[in-house]
């Protein structure tokens, strides 16, 4: 009998009150059809632009930011929409919190009087809907493979650059699945020793097809929009399939 794990990984969704949530229906329908053993959302489920440090509140852009609870209510709406179309409460589901969820922690850190209040709203959004969570930078292990929003280097910073998967593979001692850069990549690095190799999969993002966030519109992007289906056994990622958001929309929209 096959004893591996079939896992659907949803990349950075960057939910916002200003972006259509239709993609959560399509993803939910796909998950309902394929019935995986686990569902992982790799973090940055919500953008939390209300807490952005890049637009100061005194600036024109800052004055137009939504309230924190507007972002929270949008996040909760997207979670409920996804779960509605998954329509299967038996599948374990987990979120590895990302740097955009970390905005909530950073904001609270600067205002001691509200310590715990905003984090509770964030955590309850997931926990009350049966999504477990792990902290930013922490690994969630399934079948010997580590899942995290983005691995952190020796300086506590995210691995980055054009070939960050190669850098991660150089330092990793087990297979890793992550997101953050919005680019789907699958890198297998040979190793000396019993494990023989490590495999690093970057799952891209789960934004609408061809949607680029405002902060990156003039950047070098090469983003990948979709979800990833993984097969894990013998402590390795053995299968990796990228399903584009365009295909999901055509099939389930």
Task: Indicate where each model-derived feature is located.
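Active-site neighborhood of divalent metal-dependent phosphoester bond hydrolases
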Residues: 51-136
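Conserved acidic residues
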Residues: 37-39, 91, 144, 174-175
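Active-site metal-binding loops of divalent metal-dependent hydrolases
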Residues: 11-15, 43-47, 99-101, 150-152, ...
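Hydrophobic/aromatic residues located in beta-strands of well-ordered beta-sheets
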Residues: 39, 93-95, 200
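Short acidic-hydrophobic surface loop/beta-edge motif
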Residues: 1, 137-143, 188-190
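A short acidic (Asp/Glu
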Residues: 19-21, 49-53, 104-109, 158-159, ...
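N-terminal active-site segment of His-dependent metallophosphoesterases
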Residues: 1-80
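Conserved beta-sheet core of the metallophosphoesterase superfamily
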Residues: 145-243
């Amino acid at each position: 009998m096959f004893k591996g794990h079939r896992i659907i990984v949803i990349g950075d969704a960057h939910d916002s009150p200003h972006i259509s949530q239709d993609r959560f229906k399509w993803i939910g329908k796909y998950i309902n059809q394929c019935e995986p053993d686990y569902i992982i959302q790799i973090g940055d489920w919500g953008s939390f632009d209300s807490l952005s440090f890049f637009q100061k509140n005194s600036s024109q852009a800052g004055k137009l930011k939504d309230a924190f609870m507007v972002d929270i209510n949008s996040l909760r709406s997207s979670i409920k929409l996804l779960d509605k179309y998954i329509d299967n409460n038996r599948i374990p589901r987990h979120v590895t919190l990302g740097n955009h969820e970390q905005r909530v922690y950073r904001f609270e850190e600067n205002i001691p009087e509200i310590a715990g209040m905003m984090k509770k709203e964030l955590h309850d959004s997931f926990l009350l809907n049966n999504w477990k969570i792990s902290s930013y930078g922490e690994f969630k292990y399934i079948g010997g493979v580590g899942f995290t929003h983005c691995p952190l280097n020796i300086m506590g910073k995210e691995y980055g650059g054009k070939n960050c998967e190669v850098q991660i593979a150089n330092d990793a001692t087990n297979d890793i699945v992550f997101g953050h850069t919005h680019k789907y990549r699958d890198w297998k690095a040979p190793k000396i020793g019993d494990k023989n190799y490590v495999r690093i999969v970057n799952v891209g993002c789960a934004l609408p097809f061809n949607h680029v966030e405002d902060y990156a519109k003039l950047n070098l992007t090469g983003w990948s929009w979709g979800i990833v289906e993984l097969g894990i056994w013998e402590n390795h990622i053995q299968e990796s399939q990228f399903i584009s958001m365009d295909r999901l929309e055509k099939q389930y929209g």
